[in-house]
Amino acid sequence: MGYARPKPERLAEKLGQIRIALGLSQTEMHRRLGAEEMIAYTQISKYESGRREPSLMILLQYARVAGVHMEALVDDDLDLPKKLPGPVKYGEINRAYVSRSRNKKR
């Protein structure tokens, strides 16, 4: 059997950090994610408050917009970089270095 990763407890916090670090409103973040046809813009607020969990496709878009590897979003032991690299250009591999959280929440 495969290993099931526990639900990330810091995901909502990290999604909000990304939007704020990029200086975007929730509506602008919705557009930047390219999610107009997948979700309503009001879902961004629900993701950031932890009331809803984004789909894999939306998580991939958040990682792309922020320029970080998706693992930085879903692994509670990893922090986002202090400065987000920004969107990854097509064909470019860009993995942001992340630091292990000193305050593990377990």
Which positions does each model-derived feature cover?
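Residue-level signal for the short linker/turn that defines the boundary of a DNA-recognition helix
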Residues: 13, 23-24, 39, 54-57
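A short, Lys/Arg-rich alpha-helix, primarily the initiator
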Residues: 1-22
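Hydrophobic micro-packing sites on short alpha-helices
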Residues: 29, 58-63, 73-74
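Residue-level recognition of specific faces of alpha-helices
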Residues: 14, 43-46, 72
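Residue-level detection of the helix-turn-helix DNA-binding "recognition helix"
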Residues: 20, 34-35, 49-51, 78
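Short, charged recognition helix plus adjacent turn
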Residues: 2-5, 64, 74-106
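Short alpha-helical DNA-recognition segment
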Residues: 22-46
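Short, basic-rich loop-to-helix N-cap that marks the start of a DNA-contacting helix
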Residues: 41-42, 49-64, 80
